[in-house]
C-alpha cells in the first residue's frame, strides 16, 4: 500500500497489536491457520498461542509464497476490524469468482485474491498499491477501517471499535443513554490489567447491594444503585470485546449476577412492604 506498514508494528488497541487482533479474530471465527508476510523473523503472539495453541502461522517474506496455491484474504497490519466486520467481509467474498479489493469509506486495506490469479499487464503481487488499483472494488455492509501514518498513536482505532461495540440485542435505552456513560468508563478500563470477569464481579456486588436499601425503606437510593449497576454492567462486555477476552463463562457469570441483582431488588421490596413500620409508603418514606 502507499503507507509504510513497518510503522504499524507496535500500534496497539487494548494492549493488543493490530496484527495479533486480526489473528485472534480469525482463530475465534474458526480459522485454523494464517500466513504472515513480514521481514521480522519469528514474531511471537503470546495471547494467540495461549488461547489457540493449535492455530498455525506460516511466515514468509514474500507474498508470492502464498499466491496461486489457494484463495487468500490479505489484511494489512494497519487494519482495524471486529468480528462482525470480518463476517460481513467473508459474506461478500463467499461467492466471488474474481479477485477483489474490500473497500469502505476509504480503502480498507483488505484484498481477496483468487487461486491462479494472473495479470496480463505484469502487475507485481508484492505491490499492494498496484493490486488495489487493478482489482475490482466491493464494499461489505459493515466495513473495517485502515489507519494512516498520521493516526499512529492516536485513539482513532480505539474510538472506531467503540463506535461499533453495541450488541444487536441491546435495547434503545442501553445504546442511546447508558452507553454515553459506560463507554468513557470502558475507555479507561481497557488501559488497566483488570479482567472483564473482575469488572463483572464488582458491578454485580453493586447491583446486589440495592436490595439492602429497598429493605430498609430507602427505595429511591436502591433504584439509583440498581440503575448505576445497569449502566456499569455494559463495561465488562465492552472491555471484553475490545480486548478480545469474551468467553462463555464470562457470559454466564454476567447473567448469573444480573439475576442475583434483580432477586435482591424484589426481596428488598418484599421485606419493606411487609414491615408495618414502613407500610404504607408515604412521600417521606419513598424519598428518605
Identify what each model region corresponds to.
Residues 80-142:
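Conserved core of the sugar-phosphate nucleotidyltransferase
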Residues 224-270:
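Acidic (Asp/Glu-rich) catalytic motifs at the cytosolic membrane interface
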Residues 1-45:
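N-terminal glycine-rich phosphate-binding loop and ensuing alpha1 helix
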Residues 19, 78, 195:
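Residue-level signal for inorganic ion chemistry
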Residues 211-224, 268-288:
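Helix-coil boundary and interhelical linker segments in multi-pass alpha-helical membrane proteins
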Residues 42-106:
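Conserved beta-loop-beta/alpha segment of the NTase-like Rossmann-fold superfamily
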Residues 198-201, 221-224, 252, 256, ...:
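Alpha-helical transmembrane segments of integral membrane proteins
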Residues 135, 139-221, 231:
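Topogenic membrane-insertion module of multi-pass membrane proteins
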Amino acid at each position: 500500500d502507499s503507507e509504510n506498514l513497518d510503522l504499524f508494528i507496535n500500534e496497539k488497541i487494548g494492549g493488543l497489536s493490530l496484527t495479533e487482533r486480526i489473528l485472534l479474530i480469525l482463530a475465534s471465527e474458526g480459522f485454523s491457520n494464517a500466513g504472515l508476510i513480514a521481514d521480522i523473523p519469528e514474531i511471537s503472539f503470546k495471547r494467540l498461542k495461549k488461547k489457540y495453541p493449535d492455530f498455525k502461522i506460516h511466515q514468509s517474506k514474500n507474498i508470492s509464497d502464498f499466491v496461486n496455491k489457494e484463495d487468500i484474504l490479505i489484511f494489512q497490519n494497519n487494519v482495524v476490524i471486529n468480528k462482525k466486520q470480518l463476517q460481513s467481509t467473508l459474506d461478500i467474498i463467499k461467492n466471488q469468482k474474481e479477485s477483489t479489493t474490500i473497500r469502505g469509506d476509504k480503502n480498507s486495506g483488505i484484498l481477496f485474491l483468487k487461486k491462479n490469479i494472473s495479470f496480463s499487464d505484469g502487475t507485481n503481487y508484492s505491490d499492494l498499491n498496484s493490486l488495489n488499483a487493478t482489482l475490482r472494488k466491493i464494499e461489505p455492509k459493515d466495513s473495517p477501517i485502515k489507519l494512516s501514518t498520521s493516526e499512529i498513536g492516536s485513539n482513532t482505532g480505539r474510538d472506531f471499535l467503540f463506535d461499533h461495540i453495541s450488541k444487536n440485542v441491546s435495547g434503545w435505552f442501553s445504546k442511546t443513554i447508558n452507553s454515553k456513560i459506560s463507554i468513557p468508563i470502558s475507555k479507561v478500563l481497557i488501559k488497566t490489567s483488570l479482567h472483564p470477569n473482575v469488572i463483572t464481579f464488582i458491578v454485580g456486588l453493586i447491583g446486589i447491594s440495592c436490595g439492602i436499601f429497598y429493605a430498609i425503606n430507602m427505595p429511591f437510593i436502591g433504584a439509583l444503585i440498581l440503575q448505576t449497576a445497569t449502566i456499569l454492567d455494559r463495561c465488562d462486555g465492552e472491555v471484553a470485546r475490545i480486548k478480545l477476552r469474551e468467553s462463555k463463562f464470562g457470559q454466564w457469570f454476567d447473567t448469573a449476577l444480573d439475576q442475583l441483582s434483580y432477586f435482591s431488588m424484589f426481596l428488598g421490596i418484599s421485606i419493606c412492604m411487609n414491615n408495618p413500620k414502613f407500610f404504607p409508603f408515604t412521600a417521606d418514606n419513598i424519598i428518605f
